């Protein structure tokens, strides 16, 4: 009799523990507003929805949003990957923000200022996946948010080596999450972290943001080099010296050197410069093959952040008296001042210096 009672008690205890875990899991699920329905915003929205969060995916084009709702996928930017049932497309920006526990921006850098000026102040804080700087003011995106919502407003930037299709397909990925507020950072970490995504924490907002902006320009450079047929040696040199440029700029602005050796720095740089899933690299490949810039952009079909950010990064470097010869040559090429082979020649003929 006692054996039966003990066995029954253990069984009931296990059932109670399971019910408690399920209840706590349900309680921890949140409503997320993902502002930006391009490939990256959609991929992260799919990830968040798959792990149980109700996810509102905002897009600026009503026809695009209607198509996503009808097909339960994003055929324009992430075809072939179905939406979970709890991922809801929307074209109502304000309603998305007001309905959400957490707001994440995933629009291109040139649209970032417009979005934060339209939305009401989020209750918890603001996170973004956008990689770049503001083209009008040459400011980091964190500076724009501070101007809009205050310097003490909790923010987070999520960056690192990550392609949209792989995240949407639940393939293993590691990211860096930088924030100015440890409590908000902890909440965002809990929101994202899962078996397929490992999130590392940082407080170096400047470094993480610069890494995300500069690596796109360097990916264009590597694409051009490969398009010209210059081989692996040249690409390795561009990545290595590009990392040096990125680090110099960051240190001049108060970033930490270890950030540039981490996921947001060398991790994202190597991925973007070497894999053809990178639209910046593919854009560079086309330029190296003498495809005109407008036609190259048309063939890519999505925003090429490196093209939009080259002038801004060079302006920031000039302001901080930092030499960035690779970025400067890419900027000159994008403005029609030099052609691809001349840009390489200009880099190779620079005066000798210590590494």
Residue ranges and their predicted role:
Residues 15-18:
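Cationic, low-complexity basic patches in intrinsically disordered or flexible, solvent-exposed regions
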Residues 27-81:
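NAD(P)+-binding Rossmann beta1-loop-alpha1 motif at the extreme N-terminus of oxidoreductases
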Residues 83, 89-172, 188:
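Rossmann-like NAD(P)(H) cofactor-binding subdomain of soluble oxidoreductases
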Residues 111, 148-154, 172-220, 224-259:
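Internal alpha-helical scaffold of NAD(P)-dependent oxidoreductase catalytic cores
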Residues 128, 154-159, 199-203, 262, ...:
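General beta-strand structural signal in soluble alpha/beta enzymes
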Residues 215, 222-226, 251-261, 269-355:
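NAD(P)-dependent Rossmann-like dehydrogenase/reductase catalytic/cofactor-binding core
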């Amino acid at each position: 009799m006692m054996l039966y009672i003990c066995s029954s008690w253990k069984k009931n205890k296990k059932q109670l523990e399971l019910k408690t875990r399920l209840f706590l899991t349900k309680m921890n699920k949140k409503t997320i507003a993902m502002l930006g329905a391009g490939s990256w915003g959609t991929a992260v929205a799919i990830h968040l929805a798959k792990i149980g969060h109700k996810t509102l995916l905002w897009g600026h084009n009503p026809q695009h949003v209607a198509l996503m709702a009808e097909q339960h996928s994003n055929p324009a930017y992430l075809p072939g990957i179905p939406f979970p049932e709890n991922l809801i497309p929307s074209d109502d920006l304000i309603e998305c923000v007001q309905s959400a526990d957490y707001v994440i921006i995933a629009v291109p850098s040139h649209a970032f200022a417009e979005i934060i000026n339209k939305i009401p102040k989020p209750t918890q804080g603001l996170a973004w996946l956008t990689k770049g700087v503001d083209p009008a003011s040459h400011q980091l995106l964190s500076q724009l948010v501070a101007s809009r919502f205050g310097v003490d407003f909790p923010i987070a930037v999520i960056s690192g080596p990550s392609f949209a299709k792989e995240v949407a397909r639940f393939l293993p990925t590691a990211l860096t999450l930088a924030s100015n507020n440890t409590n908000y950072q902890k909440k965002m970490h809990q929101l994202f972290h899962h078996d397929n995504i490992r999130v590392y924490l940082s407080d170096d907002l400047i470094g993480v943001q610069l890494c995300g902006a500069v690596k796109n320009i360097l990916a264009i450079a590597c694409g051009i080099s490969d398009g010209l047929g210059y081989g692996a040696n040249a690409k390795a040199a561009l990545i290595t010296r590009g990392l040096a440029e990125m680090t110099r700029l960051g240190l001049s602005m108060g970033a930490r050197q270890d950030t540039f050796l981490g996921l947001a720095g060398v991790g994202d740089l190597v991925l973007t410069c070497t894999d053809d899933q990178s639209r910046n690299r593919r854009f560079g490949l086309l330029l190296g093959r003498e495809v005109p810039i407008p036609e190259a952009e048309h063939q890519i079909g999505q925003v090429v952040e490196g093209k939009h950010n080259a002038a801004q990064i060079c302006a920031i470097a000039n302001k901080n008296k930092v030499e960035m010869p690779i970025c400067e040559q890419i900027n000159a090429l994008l403005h029609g001042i030099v052609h691809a082979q001349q840009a390489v020649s200009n880099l190779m003929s620079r005066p000798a210096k210590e590494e």
